[in-house]
Amino acid sequence: MSFLEDLELNFAECIQDGGKATLGVRQREEMDTTHCMKQNEIISQAVCALLNSGGGVVRVEIENGDYNFERDGVGLNLPPLFRNHLDEMLYGKLFLIYVSSWDVAASHVRLATLCSNLYHRCGTFTEVMDPEKALKFLKRVQDPRILGDSDSLNLQEAPVDDAQMILASDLFHSPQLQYLEKLNFTKSSHVEFQMFSADLSQGIRERLPKCVSALANSEGGYVFFGVHDETRHVIGCEKEKINCTNLKSTIDACIRKMPVYHFCGQNHKVQYELKFLEVYDKEALHGYVCAIKVERFCCAAFAKAPDSWEIKDNNKKPLTANDWASRMIEINPDLSSFPQMIPWKSMLNTTPCSKTVFTHKYLKCVEDLQKDYFPVSPNRITYTPESVYKDLFADYRGLRNLINMEMRCFSQGILIFSHSWAVDLGLQRRQDVICDALLISPNNVPILYTICNKWDLGNRHYSMKVARTLKQKLVNMGGYPGRLGIIPLVLPLGSHQRVRNDLEMPVYPESYNFITTQQVEALLQSLVIILFGFRPLLNEELNLESETVALLSDQQYGLLSTNLSKHREMFVHGLPGSGKTTLALMIVGKIRNVFNCQADNILYICENQSLKRFIVRKNVCQAVTRKTFMKNTFDNVQHIIVDEAQNFRTEDGNWYAKAKAITQRARDGPGVLYIFLDYFQINHLCCSGLPELQHQKPLLKLTRMLRSGDNITSYLQDIMHQIRENPPPNVPQEALMVGEELEWGPDVTGNLEITDNLNLEQMSVYVAEKCQSLWRSGYFTDVAVLFTRARDIEKCRDKLLLAMRRRSMSQLAEEPSLLVQVREGLDSLGSHVVLESVHRFSGMERSIVFGIIPMGSETAIFYNALLCLASRARTHLYIVKVVF
């Protein structure tokens, strides 16, 4: 086996090829300069890409066979800022550079960058901005109120040298110049002199973008090609050597090619004016000076794309100017409209790919979750989770002894079992694998044990893939900034066992060993973010520029960590706002990975069209309403998820019996049938088709109401009390005996207003004025106007539209962003006002909800409908009782 193949097989890392290189300080000094720089460039780009993508290894083939690491040194000229993230080691005939992730907090910038290619004028010189200065410049341009460094002027206030600019302008408009004429002004922050090079076009391409970028990013100015930069003598280019038409085309193409980044919504390039000034030697035309007037650019002008790289599809790719600039200035998302969510980890203090992590203020923080689920005990190896490893030890004879034998080499740490770490990470499970266990121990590199029926190359590759994915997620999602490697190790169980080949164990530098308990706990906290973290629906609903990660509750995580292979059927009773639909989608993803099935093998069933369309957009499974389900056969379906099941009916047949039959028909075992419901939110008095409560087994309850602010949640509890006192006749009383009393913290969140006895006109004005006030205060235009009776939408639509339009138009001139759309239904997400019936809005949510309730309309399910309506609101709930 070659060293390259051996490296790929043994290291669970993103490995980038650094090409061939001569190593050694003296040896590289003796190399051809161009060749030396090229080798350095290839290696630097690979290192940069790994820094921005979670780390990895750069492999370099050593060209000089007599190279000795201890004697010769390395000699590579890598950027100083990169060196703190690098370790080096020989591996046979390869030189390995171990790259840890870029540390955003330590470097103060989001991305590792070789060169920003963003220039500015520093006195009379053109200089490239280092990444930190480039970030400050971008922030100043984005918001002129932000002041720069003491040595860097605010772009909006920097004075222009009027005298120099006037003289430069006079020269630019001169009818002709004299050969060797000495100009009466010097280079300045707004004037640049350049001599023509022997190759006119090539010289322009190399030097002009830097000059134009620097001037455009300042206050504008002039570049004169053909003027000596020290003596100020006019030289020009001899007329025989210049073709003005061709050179004009070269200059135009050069400037048009320069990348720009706009904050202002425009898309124009750098504006300039070009003239060729005639230069005379006495009376004869000698040549030309090329004069370029550069206008000040509104935002940021790059000489070329930044020299910054990332890993995409396992290959290094350059970042575009747009991607680089937008990621550099990326900040934590504004979730002021969600006061119940608090930031735990800022994206500005972690790694380049990580996102801001939010937790619910009444849930455990990451540190507490880590101590509960992954405790680190001194002087012992802790096995966890108890339910998982005991289940595995009971099912697989010899597994306990195998694990205990392996742990004899370690005195302290934590061994985390999983039925499949692949599934936990969003990968497909390998059927031959019994389980995985992750060991994190002080003074060692973490080890991922893959226990399988036999050792083979397929299981080895599987273990490698899982270990590599885990490492990447710990860094890129969990935000772990330290040095990290994970060693994959396959352990066969039973008669196929063989002695482990230690050659399979990759070697990491000593700096990759965990030294302290604090390091172990920091990694475990990143692991908590991976296992408990999910992408909340508000990312897409509100089109947030920066994505966020939210954390599951204990109850939600308990459901998601259920072993689907053993628990194929489940009834999940969840209170309003407990995350039922989000969990249903996550269960769909887990089914696909556990059973290696496709989207068309999984069916999601709900009662209303709006929720169905919402799920269809996710493109993770089939989604239909109950009525459609009863009309079709679904031959490919193996697994079924039912959501909002309390609102199902039996008028079209026994849906539960049909779903049960579909999931039981496979020869290789039953499929998954998970049913989510909330009896509190039932919207009819008919038979739901659900089994009797005593037959709904196994049953799991979600009692934490997490969606809404405190005042709204308190209101929901009051309504639930009314429902318990007066339950609908088709709801079992014992099903309503769930819930919990919540204790509010000092900062009570959520806004609740109840208004009575409004007519249609007053109601329309009330809604429009409240929306206008909220939007002026900075809240998202994320509004639903919900009606307890669908027929009332038609009565109110025109009056609501007119009232909203009047208030939007009245302030359009001063605040055009407040002009919003009013729509019926939920065919699209985004910033608009939705008019819908509460029954059709079941399973959905909005930040701001207006509930339109007819006066005197109480029925047997009045409080159920009111609960469903009120629980749609995250932060603002307005109950409006209307006289129709």
From Swiss-Prot:
This is Schlafen family member 5. The keyword ATP-binding applies. Belongs to the Schlafen family. Subgroup III subfamily. GO terms for cellular component: nucleus. InterPro entries: P-loop_NTPase, Poxin-SLFN/SLFN_N, Schlafen, Schlafen_AlbA_2_dom, Schlafen_AlbA_2_dom_sf, SLFN_3-like_DNA/RNA_helicase, SLFN_GTPase-like, UvrD-like_helicase_C. Keywords: ATP-binding, Differentiation, Nucleotide-binding. It comes from the Eukaryota. One of its GO terms (biological process) is cell differentiation. May have a role in hematopoietic cell differentiation. ATP binds at residues 574-581. The keyword Membrane does not apply. One of its GO terms (molecular function) is ATP binding.
